[in-house]
């Protein structure tokens, strides 16, 4: 929906769009994306204090459906902002609470709990694969071009409304059978007096915002850029207020404070300049399809590993099959950087399937801290290698066995043996002496910086471990170690490249 909404805003009117400039359309999308994540704070509070997660998710789904119905109406800019407002509020109600509904299907000890979340993620990404095909098909006239040469974006928006309608029907019918009655009530119901006080402050804030917007309009400063600035201030102030309330509340336990840093990730979502760059990724639907395909493969393998008896043996065989498929995708379709980073994630998933105690035997206590810096050091090495490969592309060198190798045709040696000493080999004929000097200088700087980087990561890791053992449940620390373990097959993966 976000991709087609962007096109809808800046396509010419003659092509079925609104005729906005690309800058304005991108700015509106940034506002939309930021408000979605800000609204989740409100949705979580309403679920915990007023309605309960089950009702909150339902209300959110209804508002999202209504927002897409409004978008499906060919009323131009008049209804655009109203529909976005409905979708923002609806997403804020649904997004933070729907995962809670999935978790409520099973007890904490039930081994099917993780598989349930994998099915949930599988369904989301399955929809992400279907949508880039189905929406253009509808916009172009359902395969028979009933709209002529124009794109009918409203037909695409209507599909989202129809999908949400059937989702709500299934949610209501299935909820009566599978969802617990506890989800119908809030976890920490608010007193009537406190609720009235909250409503009073909400009304005051809304009036203040309207007054600010009216004042900006009065002096001719009501523009998209200025609205973004206003929202940026709000995006900074609201999380700070949220943290203050969390730390001051007597209802928040020490363990719950252990995950208080999670909302900090909001800053990456709410930084508008980064948000503008993210829009370019939205437009690249083909790459999005590949990414969602990869996530579905991951979800399937995790579900299989949990639900199938003797999961270690079966999961390893299934994972090998997934790796073979992913190798083919990576070598033929996906850009190099995307493949390497995605494979790194997949390889860490592999640690979930190791026999109990296998990793512990190979990991010494004193080296655990070092494992946490595997990813940043690997990425740094990757940058060095790519930089060196660019310099040496097409040139000849000899591998460790004395066999002549062309870097462009056989990059394996470039990734397994490249280091600063490689540039000193007589067999390398660089394009010019000054390139060699610059390369040596830059690479020496990066290698010298390793000492500082390692010291910093050791300190950060030790601080993080102390904090984790003090505040985070043991299971969370364990999972963290699972994903920060030494990557033994990374070398093999790079050889495949």
UniProtKB/Swiss-Prot annotation:
It comes from the Bacteria. PROSITE patterns: MFS, PTR2_1, PTR2_2. It is found in: Cell membrane. GO terms for biological process: oligopeptide transport; protein transport. One of its GO terms (molecular function) is peptide transmembrane transporter activity. The chain crosses the membrane at residues 3-23, 26-46, 57-77, 84-104, 119-139, 155-175, 199-219, 227-247, 294-314, 321-341, 372-392, 452-472. Keywords: Cell membrane, Membrane, Peptide transport, Protein transport, Transmembrane, Transmembrane helix, Transport. It holds the Pfam family PTR2. GO terms for cellular component: plasma membrane. It is a multi-pass membrane protein. Belongs to the major facilitator superfamily. Proton-dependent oligopeptide transporter (POT/PTR) (TC 2.A.17) family. Proton-dependent uptake of di- or tri-peptides. This is Di-/tripeptide transporter.
């Amino acid at each position: 929906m976000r991709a087609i909404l962007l096109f809808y805003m800046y396509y010419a009117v003659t092509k079925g769009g609104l005729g906005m400039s690309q800058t304005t359309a991108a700015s509106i999308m940034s506002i939309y994306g930021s408000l979605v994540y800000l609204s989740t704070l409100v949705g979580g509070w309403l679920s915990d204090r007023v309605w309960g997660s089950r009702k909150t998710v339902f209300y959110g789904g209804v508002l999202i459906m209504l927002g897409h119905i409004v978008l499906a109406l060919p009323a131009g800019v008049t209804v655009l902002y109203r529909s976005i407002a409905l979708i923002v509020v609806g997403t804020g109600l649904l997004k933070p609470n729907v995962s809670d509904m999935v978790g409520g299907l099973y007890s904490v000890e039930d081994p099917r709990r993780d598989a349930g979340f994998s099915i949930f993620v599988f369904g989301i990404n399955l929809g992400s694969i279907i949508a880039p095909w189905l929406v253009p098909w509808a916009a172009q006239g359902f395969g028979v071009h009933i709209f002529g040469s124009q794109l009918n974006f409203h037909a695409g928006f209507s599909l989202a409304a129809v999908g949400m309608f059937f989702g709500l029907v299934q949610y209501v019918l299935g909820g009566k059978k599978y969802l617990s009655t506890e989800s119908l009530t809030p976890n920490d119901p608010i007193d009537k007096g406190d609720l009235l006080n909250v409503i009073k402050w909400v009304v005051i804030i809304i009036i203040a915002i309207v007054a600010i917007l009216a004042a900006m309009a009065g002096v001719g400063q009501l523009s998209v850029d200025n609205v973004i600035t206003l929202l940026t201030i709000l995006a900074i102030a609201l999380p700070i207020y949220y943290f203050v309330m969390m730390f001051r509340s007597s209802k928040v336990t020490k363990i719950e404070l252990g995950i208080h840093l999670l909302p900090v990730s909001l800053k990456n979502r709410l930084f508008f300049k980064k948000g503008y760059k993210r829009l370019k990724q939205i437009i690249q639907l083909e790459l999005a399809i590949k990414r969602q395909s990869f996530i579905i493969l991951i979800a399937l393998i995790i579900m299989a590993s949990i639900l199938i008896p003797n999961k270690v043996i079966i999961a390893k065989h299934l994972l090998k099959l997934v790796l073979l498929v992913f190798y083919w995708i990576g070598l033929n379709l996906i850009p190099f950087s995307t493949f390497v980073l995605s494979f790194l994630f997949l390889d860490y998933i592999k640690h979930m399937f190791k026999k109990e105690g296998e990793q512990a035997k190979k990991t010494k206590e004193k080296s655990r801290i070092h494992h946490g810096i595997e990813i940043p050091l690997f990425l740094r090495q990757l940058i060095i290698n790519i930089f060196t490969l660019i310099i040496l592309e097409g040139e000849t060198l000899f591998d460790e066995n004395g066999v002549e190798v062309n870097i462009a045709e056989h990059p394996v040696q470039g990734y397994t043996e490249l280091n600063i000493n490689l540039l000193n080999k007589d067999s390398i004929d660089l394009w010019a002496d000054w390139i060699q000097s610059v390369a040596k200088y830059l690479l020496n700087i990066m290698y010298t910086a390793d000492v500082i980087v390692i010291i910093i990561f050791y300190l950060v890791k030790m601080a993080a471990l102390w904090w984790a053992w003090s505040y985070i449940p043991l299971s969370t620390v364990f999972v963290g170690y699972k994903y920060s373990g030494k990557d033994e097959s990374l070398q093999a993966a790079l050889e495949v490249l």
